[in-house]
Amino acid sequence: MKRKQQEDDNDDGVEKAVSPVLATTSNTMSTDLLLQSSSKLSQKQDYIFHGGRRHVRPYYFEFISHVNKRWTGKTIVDLFADEFKGRPRDYYVGAVKSGRIKVDGEIVPVSYIVKSSQKITHFLHRHEPPVMIDDVVILHQEPDVVTVCKPASVPVHPCGQYRKNTIVGILDAEHDLGTLFPIHRLDRLVSGLLIIARTAAKADFFRQQIEGGMVKKRYIAKVIGVFPEDEMIVDANINYNGSEGRSTAEDANSSGDDKKVKGKPACTKFTRIDTNGTHSLVSCEPVTGRTHQIRVHLQYTGHPIANDPLYLNQHIDNLETYIAKRIDAGERKIVSPDDYVYSSEDFSIDPMCTNCPKLIPQGYEEHDEALWLHCVQYCGTGWEYECPYPSWASL
């Protein structure tokens, strides 16, 4: 489901983590350089484990951004109320009056009109969404590379609302691995093999092979129905709609000469591993790397991933009823903010925070589970890494 935009969803500008006392002395770091910072991103005590989820203790954080053309001429309160609707207008009025929102380091009146290129800072109590409690298992470790089994629901690196509840953040808290350079991405709900370089030189080595088309990758998926026994190659363009957060596939050969095909070229090879008549296990080898490529190409074949919340709806008459049945059967779990209300013994409650005393951020309520798509192998010139199959990969 879609959530109202929070500042956490804004990747523009600069951000820094701070404490209430050290707010003026903490080091500023660019979002792009966050992975390469020598300071600790996370520590073990940052996490709370409850109800099958890994939560992050809320912490103070300062967002820094610069006034762009669209913002210029707005009052400071209108800017935040219009651009970041995840908090009510009254909150922003209070934040400006109290100095939690500043312009060029100065407290300004609520009627202040912002000007181009001014620096705006917002000091707030940050709550991150929870992730599934599964460990980040180290599969293979060398001086210049480490491979892990990424659990579903955990982003690879800091982005959007996630910072500490990421693979990079969890590894920083639980293992002394130093600087980390993830060399490829997996969607948040996808699990499996993740390769992480430990030196810039090794990261560049992998990058050159990936960009040169020298790397092969393989996933497994659990799909609806009896997948064809013969190998199937899907060659269909993928068009990603950022506002909807989903992709569509279109076959260039069936579009007609007078119709322009949307999206980018994409190709995936599928091979059936097993079937029980209701579901099939399928080996998936993406030749290209488009957004949601495997998921949308499987939907295109008529055999979508059997628990895919985005691409299953066209193949289930009543998706809400289907999900409800799986919840009743214990196959899915609902995470709701109302399930997690804590006291000051668990974390410091901020009187101005719109999330406290709840642990989960406002607007977060999802049917969060492991998507039945798992990366099992990456191989290139002179190297190969694998990841064991997940528990759902049986029929």
UniProtKB/Swiss-Prot annotation:
Polar residues bias spans: 244-255
Gene3D superfamilies (UniProt xref): Pseudouridine synthase (3.30.2350.10)
Keyword Nucleotide-binding appears in the UniProt entry: no
Xref: Pfam families: PseudoU_synth_2 (PF00849)
Domain of life: Eukaryota
Keyword Isomerase: yes
PROSITE patterns assigned to the protein according to its UniProt record, in alphabetical order: PSI_RLU, S4
Entry keyword set: Isomerase, RNA-binding
GO molecular-function terms, A-Z: pseudouridine synthase activity; RNA binding
InterPro entries, sorted: PsdUridine_synth_cat_dom_sf (IPR020103), PsdUridine_synth_RluA-like_CS (IPR006224), PsdUridine_synth_RluC/D (IPR006225), PsdUridine_synth_RsuA/RluA (IPR006145), RluA_PseudoU_synthase (IPR050188)
Active-site feature positions: D187
Name the UniProt record assigns to this protein: RNA pseudouridine synthase 7
Lineage: Eukaryota, Viridiplantae, Streptophyta, Embryophyta, Tracheophyta
